[in-house]
């Protein structure tokens, strides 16, 4: 186990030493030469032709003026803010500008104006060399002359030749062109299309309900008539009428009111069958009559149907008490059909 550890330590030390040696050798091999050790004119001489231009057409850098750098005194004066100058010479700020920039500004002011059509030529340096800070020198760029050939306008020879041939042709040989007769077009009258209006059907007015016919005043009559030619006696007759809630009243006849006290409206009345149809006011113990008639006037107070049923019931009871017969309005024996007709008539007035 210890031998294996010792072997690993030795191998690790050898590997570290090899890496260090390889790094030193690589750094020395790739160490670039200083830019100042070689003259400026000898850079990339192998890539230039006999006239001094490289394969891109860029010539060598020419120094036209190498004025000594002016000493710029640095004062510890108060810092100035940058100002705008229109047409005046720009004064360098010792706090804002460096000596190199001041030299560049002074040299650029003395340079002649360059042509706008000249191309910018940049010097090409090798990638292995370290570029130091450039020296502020003015470089005059030579304008590149470009020969522009003016296009030659060619005359239309074919047009001229055709024009001369037309002029040389005699007039007799020119074919005559007959004018085509232009027939005037007939103005067609456009008939307007019938416009079909969307007729919205008006809603039909609902028929107004017909007013119910006004029933004319009428009556229903029943009579109690004595049998076998006998007469109804006054005292017995009056007592029987009063027992069935009939009250002697207006016009000297008996009335059945809506209430038993006689204060409500009259429902039906009982009169004498003999003219003038009234009863004696003094009691009339000697009074006699062949019969008594009951009348229900239509329209009446309350329900005509109920009033008729009440009158029919009263007439039947009085006829039973007096041993008499019940007659209709024609003085004939009343029948079930006649009673049904009376009820239908009373029903009509009840709905009115």
Swiss-Prot record:
Pfam families: ZipA_C. Residues 35-56 are annotated as: Disordered. The keyword Nucleotide-binding does not apply. It is a single-pass type I membrane protein. The chain crosses the membrane at residues 6-26. One of its GO terms (biological process) is division septum assembly. InterPro entries: Cell_div_ZipA, ZipA_FtsZ-bd_C, ZipA_FtsZ-bd_C_sf. It is found in: Cell inner membrane. SMART domains: ZipA_C. GO terms for cellular component: cell division site; plasma membrane. It comes from the Bacteria. Residues 27-352 are cytoplasmic. Keywords: Cell cycle, Cell division, Cell inner membrane, Cell membrane, Membrane, Transmembrane, Transmembrane helix. Residues 1-5 are periplasmic. Gene3D superfamilies: ZipA, C-terminal FtsZ-binding domain. SUPFAM superfamilies: Cell-division protein ZipA, C-terminal domain. Its main location: membrane. Residues 35-54 have a biased composition (Basic and acidic residues). Essential cell division protein that stabilizes the FtsZ protofilaments by cross-linking them and that serves as a cytoplasmic membrane anchor for the Z ring. Also required for the recruitment to the septal ring of downstream cell division proteins. Belongs to the ZipA family. HAMAP family: ZipA. Interacts with FtsZ via their C-terminal domains. This is Cell division protein ZipA. It comes from Photobacterium profundum (strain SS9).
